[in-house]
Curated annotation (Swiss-Prot):
GO cellular component, one term: mitochondrial inner membrane
Pfam families linked to this entry: Mito_carr
Membrane topology: Multi-pass membrane protein
Gene3D superfamilies: Mitochondrial carrier domain
Stated regulation of activity: Inhibited by mercuric chloride.
A GO MF label: L-arginine transmembrane transporter activity
Cysteines joined through disulfide linkages: none
Name of this protein: Mitochondrial arginine transporter BAC2
Length: 296
C-alpha cells in the first residue's frame, strides 16, 4: 500500500502535517529563550536573562542554549499536530448548534481549548521533564540516556512527575490561547475566521498575542512545574513546592523569568500559527490572499 499518498489525500493527514510544520517552527524560533526561562525559574537567585546568557556562553558555550532540543523536536510534529486535531474536534463538540459552514463559536473555541490542553498534557509531561533536566545539566548526556535512567530508577511514574501541575497549567491556558487567537485575528481582519484569507501579519500578531496571554495567565503554575520536574527531590508535591518557594524567596519567585517567557511566547506562537496556516493552504492548494507574504 502507498500509505503516504493516501494519508496526504485526507484532510486529517494534511492538517496533521501542517500542525507539524507549526510545531517545528515554534521550537526552533524560541528554544534559546526557553532555556533562559528555565534557568531563571529554577535559580534561587534573581538574575536577568542577559546575565544568565552571558554566564552560559562563557562557561558552557553557545550550544548550551540548544541543549535538550532533540527531545521536544523529536515529538513536536506529532504533539502539535494532535493538538490542532483535538482542538478542531472539541471546538465543534462543545457547541454543536453552530453549522459546519460557520466557524466555531467563541464559547466552543474556549472550551475546546481547555479540553485540548488537558489531553495533550499526557504527551507533554514526560517530554518537558526530560527537556527541563537536560537544560539544567552541564553534562552532555542525551534525552534517550536520561529517559532510560529515569525509567530504571523510578519507573514510568518518574517520567510523569508533574502531570497534575501540567494539566492545571495547560487546560485553562489553552482555552485562553485559542480564544485570544480567534478573537484577535477576527478583529484585525474582519471576516477571516470564515474566509481564511488573513495576511501573514495578522497570523503573526494574533498568534503572538495568544501566546503572551496564555503564558501570563499560567506563569506561576509553570514556575512550580519547573521546580517539581527538575529532579532534585526537594519538594513533596505542588503545595509543598509553592509553600517552600514563596517562604524562601518571596512571592516574586512566581513571576521570575516572566519577561523572557513573554518574549519567547510572542515569537514562538506567532511562528506556530503562521507556519500552520501557510502550510495548510499550500497542502489544500488554496490560493492565499495576495498580500500573505508582504502583510499589506
Amino acid at each position: 500500500m502507498d500509505f503516504w499518498p493516501e494519508f496526504m489525500a485526507t484532510s486529517w493527514g494534511r492538517e496533521f502535517v501542517a500542525g507539524g510544520f507549526g510545531g517545528v517552527a515554534g521550537i526552533i524560533s524560541g528554544y534559546p529563550l526557553d532555556t533562559l526561562r528555565i534557568r531563571q525559574q529554577q535559580s534561587s537567585k534573581s538574575g536577568s536573562a542577559f546575565s544568565i546568557l552571558r554566564r552560559m556562553l562563557a562557561i558552557e558555550g553557545p550550544s548550551s542554549l540548544y541543549r535538550g532540543m532533540a527531545a521536544p523536536l523529536a515529538s513536536v510534529t506529532f504533539q502539535n499536530a494532535m493538538v490542532f486535531q483535538i482542538y478542531a474536534i472539541f471546538s465543534r463538540s462543545f457547541d454543536s448548534s453552530v453549522p459546519l459552514v460557520e466557524p466555531p463559536s467563541y464559547r466552543g473555541v474556549a472550551l475546546g481549548g481547555v479540553a485540548t490542553g488537558a489531553v495533550q498534557s499526557l504527551l507533554l509531561t514526560p517530554v518537558e521533564l526530560i527537556k527541563i533536566r537536560l537544560q539544567l545539566q552541564q553534562t552532555k548526556s542525551g534525552p534517550i540516556t536520561l529517559a532510560k535512567s529515569i525509567l530504571r530508577r523510578q519507573g514510568l511514574q518518574g517520567l510523569y512527575r508533574g502531570l497534575t501541575i501540567t494539566v492545571l497549567r495547560d487546560a485553562p491556558a489553552h482555552g485562553l490561547y485559542f480564544w485570544t487567537y480567534e478573537y484577535v485575528r477576527e478583529r484585525l481582519h474582519p471576516g477571516c475566521r470564515k474566509t481564511g484569507q488573513e495576511n501573514l501579519r495578522t497570523m503573526l500578531v494574533a498568534g503572538g498575542l495568544a501566546g503572551v496571554a496564555s503564558w501570563v495567565a499560567c506563569y506561576p503554575l509553570d514556575v512550580v512545574k519547573t521546580r517539581l520536574q527538575q529532579g532534585h527531590g526537594a519538594y513533596e508535591g505542588i503545595a509543598d513546592c509553592f509553600r517552600k518557594s514563596v517562604k524562601q524567596e518571596g512571592y516574586t519567585v512566581l513571576w521570575r523569568g516572566l519577561g523572557t517567557a513573554v518574549a519567547r511566547a510572542f515569537v514562538v506562537n506567532g511562528a506556530i500559527f503562521a507556519a500552520y496556516e501557510v502550510a495548510l493552504r499550500c497542502l489544500f492548494n488554496q490560493s492565499p490572499s495576495p498580500d500573505i507574504v508582504t502583510g499589506d
